Regions:
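Active-site phosphate/pyrophosphate-binding segments
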Residues: 1-19, 112, 116, 132-235
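N-terminal beta-loop-helix "entrance" segment that forms/cooperates
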Residues: 35-40, 59, 216-225, 283-284, ...
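Phosphate-moiety recognition in structured ligand-binding domains
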Residues: 1-13, 89-97, 101-116, 120-125, ...
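Glycine-rich phosphate-binding loops that contact phosphosugars or nucleotide phosphates
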Residues: 19-154, 248-251, 261, 265
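A generic structural motif
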Residues: 48-55, 93-96, 205-217, 272-281
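Short hydrophobic beta-strand segments
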Residues: 23-30, 176-184, 242-247
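Residues at alpha-helix caps and immediate loop-helix transition turns in enzyme cores, especially N-
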Residues: 36, 191, 195, 255-258, ...
Length: 308
């Protein structure tokens, strides 16, 4: 829906970019720049920098393209936008049409891609659609992203039985565990961090995500499971870790190796392993699918932990 609503603005921004030479570098500015980095770094044909701070790199100027995601139109990105205008950078901002960021973005070399949902992923897809069309980003196919999200919404629906609902099953498994979330590819790793954030907010408990080398010590330090413990009669013990693997289908040798090491460490300590999978057809759609599945699980966990 966001891409459809911004179609005219995207076309105008593409037309404007066609009249300029390819930028020296692409700078994704503002606090929501990390998702763009995960998508663009392996693909962008020019140097790419994610700059989540409130300003721009000192070298940024008229030869560079600055892209900003501001799904809520808040002030956190306004200073970077104003600085890009002042320096004469090519600037493309995805934000609500009536907000402080849009006001600061007014300039000769600026384009605003209007969004209304306030959702970070939807706003990012709008920007990625523009970057694809100016040959600075990979194919996104917003319709396939939407289809992947619809499939997750159906599979994880509150009306779907526990036995066939992956989000409900994951939430139950996490009820007495500390989530250790891992994704192997760049986008799966980004989804893992977002899922861990959602789990922390939902439960008020620890939930960690990171590279395999950072998670292995956590799994290896877990005390072996005591098979004689009665969970109903004995005093509650410290929550044990549980490995949550976000599998986007990547078969790169390094990803396979790291997944194997994590699963072996978990098996050696009796740590439970749960896997979220997706068969969505594009990288962004797979990211969206994994993140939404994890978000559903976090919400079900929150509901399950509410005291009567």
């Amino acid at each position: 829906r966001e891409v459809t609503g911004a179609a005219d603005a995207i076309a105008q921004a593409v037309e404007r970019a066609a009249g300029e030479q390819r930028p020296r570098a692409v700078i994704a500015a503002g606090p929501d720049s990390r998702l763009l980095r995960a998508v663009l770094e392996p693909w962008c044909p020019v140097p790419f920098v994610a700059w989540p701070g409130p300003s721009l790199p000192g070298w940024a100027g008229g030869l560079d393209l600055v892209v900003v995601l501001a799904p809520d139109g808040g002030h956190s990105s306004a200073s970077a936008v104003a600085e890009a205008v002042r320096r004469g950078c090519q600037l493309v901002v995805a934000c609500p049409p009536a907000c402080s960021v849009a006001d600061h973005a007014v300039g000769r070399w600026s384009s605003i891609l209007p969004t209304t949902s306030g959702d970070q992923l939807a706003t990012a897809v709008v920007m990625l659609e523009f970057l694809e069309r100016v040959q600075l980003g990979p194919r996104v196919d917003s319709e396939r992203v939407a289809a992947a999200l619809d499939e997750v919404a159906i599979a994880c629906s509150p009306h779907r039985d526990l036995a066939v609902n992956p989000a409900k099953m994951l939430a139950i498994a996490l009820a007495d565990a500390t989530p250790v979330v891992w994704g192997g590819s760049v986008l799966a790793a980004r989804a893992a961090r977002r899922v861990a954030e959602s789990l922390r907010r939902a439960s008020g408990r620890t939930a960690i995500a990171g590279d395999a080398e950072h998670l292995l010590p956590v799994l290896e330090a877990a005390a072996p499971r005591d098979v004689f413990v009665d969970p109903f009669a004995d005093e509650p013990r410290e929550l044990r870790p549980m490995l949550v693997v976000l599998d986007d289908g990547s078969e790169e040798p390094l990803v396979r190796e790291e997944r194997g090491r994590l699963q072996a460490a978990a098996a050696s300590r009796g740590v439970r392993v749960e896997t979220l999978t997706t068969d969505a057809p594009t990288e962004v759609a797979r990211y969206a699918s994994l993140f939404l599945s994890g978000s559903y699980a976090a919400e079900y966990l929150r509901l399950g932990l509410v005291e009567e």
